[in-house]
UniProtKB/Swiss-Prot annotation:
Transmembrane segments: none annotated. SUPFAM superfamilies: P-loop containing nucleoside triphosphate hydrolases. Belongs to the ParA family. This is ParA family protein MPN_688. InterPro entries: AAA_dom (IPR025669), DNA_Partitioning_ATPase (IPR050678), P-loop_NTPase (IPR027417). Gene3D superfamilies: P-loop containing nucleotide triphosphate hydrolases. It comes from Mycoplasma pneumoniae (strain ATCC 29342 / M129 / Subtype 1) (Mycoplasmoides pneumoniae).
């Protein structure tokens, strides 16, 4: 199963959602293998597990540029050289700042979008769940990820700017459904404070619009909290994988969202 996390707006907890859905899958599907492929040049997936993406020896860009394994080597860096085990049953394939230039590199024919697609396909042969964290735009890496996905998760902050951007993303996704009619989409509110009228109103408005466009809308949301960043900062893990103590409420939110994603794909309720 390929799950992409997409929004062309930054700051909506996209990477946080990707890493915590992965952590929830560890709990829900312990026997199945999961991997997160980081397609965002900020490298925040690595940072979520206590890794500095700029200090890693091998990353996604090395595979794409066919960097030799060592000086004078006839063979280039492969997927196995880049995978990092970060938790039992969960690996990451990291990237770094160089991936920010993907569109320029592709235009200069250093590699092709189909090379990225091939890496994803190779991962699906080895893992039950392949999660794709994408950059905050709608450029080549994002369109490639969406074209390969079984489900696209769109986290969004319920502010006054949400509606227009979200509907444009949904319209873009509709073009991929022509080739992949089974593609599912789900909108998930993040940074939610239900004590504010604005958040309540925007959520209801987006939900209504989503249903009219045959797009799933999560029954659960991610509450506004600083605990997720604290978990990464102190424990070098997403909040879904740290000790429950004071984090149980937020762990439950991600767990329920993950169940909805699985149900959407397995039973087609959209």
């Amino acid at each position: 199963m390929i799950i992409s996390f997409v929004n062309n707006k930054g700051g909506v907890l996209k990477t946080t959602m990707a890493t915590n859905v992965a952590g929830s899958l560890v709990k829900l599907c312990p026997e199945q293998r999961k991997v997160i492929l980081d397609l965002d040049g900020q490298g925040n997936v690595s940072a979520s597990f206590g890794q500095n993406p700029e200090r890693l020896n091998n990353t996604l860009i090395d595979i794409l540029l066919k960097v030799p394994k060592f000086n004078g080597a006839n063979s280039s860096i492969e997927i196995d050289d880049c995978l990092l085990p970060v938790y039992e049953g969960l690996d990451i394939l990291p990237c770094n700042f160089e991936l920010n230039f993907a569109d320029i590199d592709i235009a200069r024919k250093k590699y092709k979008a189909s090379d990225i697609a091939e890496i994803v396909k190779q991962l699906t042969r080895r893992y039950d769940f392949v999660l794709l964290d994408t950059p905050p735009n709608m450029a080549t890496l994002v369109s490639t990820a969406m074209s390969l996905s079984d489900v696209i998760v769109i986290p969004f902050e319920p502010d006054q700017y949400s509606m227009l951007g979200l509907m444009r993303i949904v319209e873009t996704i509709d073009t991929f459904k022509e080739k992949n009619p089974n593609l599912k989409t789900i909108l998930v509110p993040t940074k939610v404070n239900m004590r504010t009228r604005l958040h309540n109103d925007v959520i209801e408005l987006v939900k209504s619009k989503a249903h009219k466009n045959n797009v799933a809308f999560s029954e659960h949301f991610v509450s506004l909290t600083s605990k997720s960043s604290a978990a990464v900062g102190y424990e070098k893990l997403p909040i879904s994988l740290v000790s429950p103590t004071s984090n149980k409420k937020y762990q439950t939110e991600y767990l329920e969202i993950t169940k909805e994603i699985l149900n959407l794909v397995n039973h087609g309720h959209q």
